[in-house]
């Protein structure tokens, strides 16, 4: 595999199974620049169309969900492996949904359900984008709802 920093060849220095053997995590070292990076291998199994709020349809994109979660978890004590596991759990729920099309609301609720117990700040950050809070009052309501459920 090519190094993402210098495009040199890399060597695998560590391999581990994650998610009960569904994912393989590999640590690699570039033979040219000596930098290290991580790659993941998994079977691409979620083949559904996501129905957006406005009715548009687009293919499910794991990377898009990962990006959204990374933004929500920015500077929070949540590792990349935990975020990856959360996305894998959401994908398992999508497979169990057993439909060719899944509303984006199903994905959003699955993520929020898991984030709530993982990290409250990341939950509020994700909810503020997912639920499109239009003002501070809506954000306050979400925080109060979260505090009531404790």
From Swiss-Prot:
Residues 48-138 form the ATP-cone domain. One of its GO terms (biological process) is negative regulation of DNA-templated transcription. PROSITE patterns: ATP_CONE. GO terms for molecular function: ATP binding; DNA binding; zinc ion binding. Binds 1 zinc ion. The keyword Repressor applies. The keyword Zinc applies. Keywords: ATP-binding, DNA-binding, Metal-binding, Nucleotide-binding, Repressor, Transcription, Transcription regulation, Zinc, Zinc-finger. It holds the Pfam family ATP-cone. A zinc finger (unnamed) spans 3-33. Its cofactor is Zn(2+). Belongs to the NrdR family. Negatively regulates transcription of bacterial ribonucleotide reductase nrd genes and operons by binding to NrdR-boxes. NCBIfam families: transcriptional regulator NrdR (TIGR00244). This is Transcriptional repressor NrdR. It comes from Herpetosiphon aurantiacus (strain ATCC 23779 / DSM 785 / 114-95).
């Amino acid at each position: 595999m090519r190094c993402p920093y210098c495009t040199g060849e890399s060597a695998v220095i560590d391999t581990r199974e994650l998610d009960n053997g569904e994912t393989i995590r590999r640590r690699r070292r570039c033979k040219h620049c000596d930098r290290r990076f991580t790659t993941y291998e998994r079977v691409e199994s979620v083949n559904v169309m996501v129905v957006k709020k406005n009715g548009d349809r687009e293919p499910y994109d794991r990377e898009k969900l990962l990006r959204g979660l990374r933004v929500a978890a920015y500077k929070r004590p949540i590792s990349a492996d935990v975020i990856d596991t959360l996305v894998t759990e959401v994908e398992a729920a999508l497979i169990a949904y057993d439909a060719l099309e899944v509303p984006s609301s199903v994905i959003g609720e699955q993520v929020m359900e898991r984030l709530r117990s993982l990290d409250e700040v990341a939950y509020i950050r994700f909810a503020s984008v997912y639920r499109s809070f239009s003002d501070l009052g809506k954000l306050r309501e979400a925080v109060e709802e979260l505090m009531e459920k404790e």
